[in-house]
Amino acid sequence: MSEEPRNYDLESQDTTERRYAYNFDFDVMHPFMMRSFESFFQDGSLLELGSFRGDFTKRFAARFDDITCVEASAEAITEARDKLGSKANILHSTFEEAALERQYDNIVLTHVLEHLDDPVGLLKRVNHEWLAKHGRFFLVCPNANAPSRQIAVKMGMISHNAAVTPAEKEHGHRCTYSLDTLERDAVAGGLEVLHRSGIFFKALANFQWDRLLSTDIVSQEYLEGCYQLGQQYPDLCSSIMLVCERGKV
């Protein structure tokens, strides 16, 4: 556990070494995540755990009318409420303290689990308390084995694929998952893994992608090619994904 209370507002701020979120996340990864989720969505309600400033939530709002969000950063919630209005019910709480009095047909946790001091504890709450009997849980994390990270290892910038860099630590990262360790924690939380995949083959760092996206060098067809290649090689993707159902409770 952390020795000092965590400041979630501070953790979500950009630093000199690393932005908390990049245009690559918003403009490339979010649409491809939605595409990866679509065939597994259940009709009904959606719970987003860690909504940040509401950018991804806006995409869910085009698909769902019943959305609840839980977010620990008060500053992020203020911005999210400005963006979303009445389209989502946003609760200011940590996951450990969240009191949700219902279950949800879809639960989404994207690029959040790696921030948690007790990831398995949250996954147990998802399985035992919040996920409906026939619901789906969508779990996405940055991938330790993404080629961009492996290249950074070969360059001597980080020690090993699953390292947590100082800049990532400033942003609240506690670990870096690969498909095997992500599934390990999902199973430890009691969940049944229905589907495993990767999202978007990625050989460049996020800041490099942002610079490319500001030019006309990268076409939509190239982005589509990276997405399709990622379906063939999930372990070499930017993000890894599990779709889970409720296990024994």
Segments predicted by a language model, with ranges:
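S-adenosyl-L-methionine-dependent methyltransferase catalytic module, highlighting the catalytic core
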Residues: 3-8, 16-28, 55, 117-129, ...
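Short catalytic micro-motifs in class I SAM-dependent methyltransferases
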Residues: 111-115
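A generic alpha-to-beta junction signature in SAM-dependent methyltransferases
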Residues: 84, 130-133
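Conserved N-terminal segment of class I S-adenosyl-L-methionine
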Residues: 1-110, 123, 198, 223-225, ...
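A short helix->loop->beta-strand "cap" motif at the edges of active sites that frequently abuts
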Residues: 65, 132-135
